[in-house]
Amino acid sequence: MTRIDAKFAELKAQGKKAFVSYVMAGDPDFDTSLELVKGLPGAGVDIIELGLPFTDPMADGPTIQLAGQRALDGGMTLQRTLDLATEFRKTDNTTPIVMMGYYNPIYSRGVDRFLADAKAAGIDGLIVVDLPPEEDSELCLPAQAAGLNFIRLATPTTDDKRLPRVLQNTSGFVYYVSITGITGSAEAEATDVGPEVARIKAATDLPVIVGFGINTPEKSRAIASVADGAVVGSAIVGQIGAGKPVAEVLAFVKTLSDGAHSA
């Protein structure tokens, strides 16, 4: 059982929904980013999605693209991202970390080496947005063999014919992208999301978490009420981009997690 599996079992026993936060590793710099990540569990975050900075982030909207650029400008690399996770694990051995990014930096490092290093750093799962299920032998299956969850995205355009393929080797949870488009580009609506989540849950026993387009405590609560949890990324990253102090960002995160947990 991974930390992700354990976390969902714990939340289920408590009758609570999950709150997942996305932050870009190294934004705006390593030390500030580490301080923020260390503070997330105390702000009610159940699972941390740690963005891996990349030069060509095709699924990311402007807010997260800028965050990635700030991180890269500050010298952030795949190795430094792993270092950040390692530092976090010195004080927190229970909060799951999912690394989210693109395949190129992983491929460049070498899959076997990357998986060994990620496992050693305390990474629990991977979301690699540009690797479709047809490429499962590249990274998904080796990741599972290494004891990491491999989490897939399902979208409004994932029809019933495609869905079984997407779910086939997914573990940990399913990440449902609530809108078609890039991150931070529109608002998620519970009335649209609810039936889609139900459709996915009819095909899998995995928890279904919803992200993209969630930017207020009210929205976090509304979306979590029709799913197993909510993910917030751009709204949090935008606060970092605006230069808000870590304590202020964490206070904002707490309002979002309270929203999801009250669902």
UniProtKB/Swiss-Prot annotation:
<dbReference type="GO" id="GO:0005829">
    <property type="term" value="C:cytosol"/>
</dbReference>
<keyword id="KW-0028">Amino-acid biosynthesis</keyword>
<feature type="active site" description="Proton acceptor">
    <location>
        <position position="49"/>
    </location>
</feature>
<comment type="subunit">
    <text>Tetramer of two alpha and two beta chains.</text>
</comment>
<comment type="similarity">
    <text>Belongs to the TrpA family.</text>
</comment>
<feature type="active site" description="Proton acceptor">
    <location>
        <position position="60"/>
    </location>
</feature>
<dbReference type="InterPro" id="IPR011060">
    <property type="entry name" value="RibuloseP-bd_barrel"/>
</dbReference>
<dbReference type="GO" id="GO:0004834">
    <property type="term" value="F:tryptophan synthase activity"/>
</dbReference>
<dbReference type="InterPro" id="IPR018204">
    <property type="entry name" value="Trp_synthase_alpha_AS"/>
</dbReference>
<keyword id="KW-0057">Aromatic amino acid biosynthesis</keyword>
<keyword id="KW-0822">Tryptophan biosynthesis</keyword>
<comment type="pathway">
    <text>Amino-acid biosynthesis; L-tryptophan biosynthesis; L-tryptophan from chorismate: step 5/5.</text>
</comment>
<dbReference type="InterPro" id="IPR013785">
    <property type="entry name" value="Aldolase_TIM"/>
</dbReference>
<dbReference type="Pfam" id="PF00290">
    <property type="entry name" value="Trp_syntA"/>
</dbReference>
<comment type="function">
    <text>The alpha subunit is responsible for the aldol cleavage of indoleglycerol phosphate to indole and glyceraldehyde 3-phosphate.</text>
</comment>
<dbReference type="InterPro" id="IPR002028">
    <property type="entry name" value="Trp_synthase_suA"/>
</dbReference>
<protein>
    <recommendedName>
        <fullName>Tryptophan synthase alpha chain</fullName>
        <ecNumber>4.2.1.20</ecNumber>
    </recommendedName>
</protein>
<keyword id="KW-0456">Lyase</keyword>
